[in-house]
Amino acid sequence: MAKIPAGLHSQMNSMSNDEPIPVIIRRKQGFFRSQAMPMVAEVEQSFQLFPGEAVKITAAEIDELSRQEGIEEIWPDLPVRTWLDTSVPVIAAPKVWALGVKGAGIKVAVVDTGIDSTHPDFAGRIMATKSFVSDSAQDDNGHGTHVASIVAGSGAKSNGKYVGVAPEASLYVAKVLRADGSGSMSGVMAGIEWAVLEQNVKIINLSLGGVGSCDGTDALSVMCDEAVTQAGVVVCVAAGNTGPEERTVGSPGCARLVITVGAMDDSGRIASFSSRGPTADGRVKPDIVFPGVNIVAAQAAGTHMGQVVAAGYVAANGTSMATPHASGVAALMLQDNPELTADQVKTKMLAGAVDLGVPANDQGVGRGDAFKAYEQATATPTPTPPPTPTPPTPTPPPDSKPSEPQGCLAALFSRR
């Protein structure tokens, strides 16, 4: 495998010799930074889920670095952005609440634009925050607050009208996007590692991504898959808002092990903006769809995202809004069966979906259903009944012969 992907080669050729290029480097296992990249003096960010660093170096330095034995791959550190372009009853979440299950004790990370920590809908449930782009994790865009509200808003300010999918889940917020909704892959990756390695979350919501088809081998997609395999974290990712054309699911929605979420309206029609598959390497994406049109959730103070529908609440569209529905459903599933692996959560969530009768690369397996996913998560396998004892066959008299059926059965069992 080439250490420098074609896209980075093109970028190198278009830049002046002394202009720094932001890249993400993956070292081979067993090579320390000083061994693998001795010519790199300054590092923007170091990673632990895989051995690597984010740096800014010139095209000549990238070329030199690619020749080092300890370097496995060099990726461009591409920009990412938010995917913003009456949903909870549609996915049957209240039926799960009626069982006393609202996501209590489940740690969900929202990696986004931050959160309005003063909003009443989050009172007592923002457990930790960290900003990777500014001094404060306070939301100066509005997107992260809206997303967090869909996952776990209590609806307190609306007297219970605008409630999130898992209103008792605990929130961990990494601010990785700036006030204009933009950020970098390396910044998102840093937020993921903080959530996984420092906060031990069970679920990560990524309502963000890059533009353009991908095959799941870029740095951010690889990091998401590492979070699933190494830490057992459920990672829910927005498919993107560049539909309805095919091959429009961007990174990290093209990652293999994440739950990639497309958007539908309340009537079950796939939103025109929802990105479609397949991925660049031919896999079906998205995996599932949830409501993402005219979704009402909390508004961050002082922000202007979406359309105001009530004091403290705005309506917005996008796969950004669909994705936290999946994260909330995962929290409901894990509350009563915390031993589920990330792969089991994905498998069972998809098994409970309702087919909308459209192509798989538009809908995945169909519309997510919180109650059916919960049933899948908590179903007790039917035990296999013990074999019925077979009485011993009487010994035939010396002059008798075994019957033909006995001979057939003996031959059958001898083939195992």
Regions flagged by a language model, labelled:
Residues 120-122, 127, 138, 266, ...:
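Catalytic-core environment of secreted peptidases
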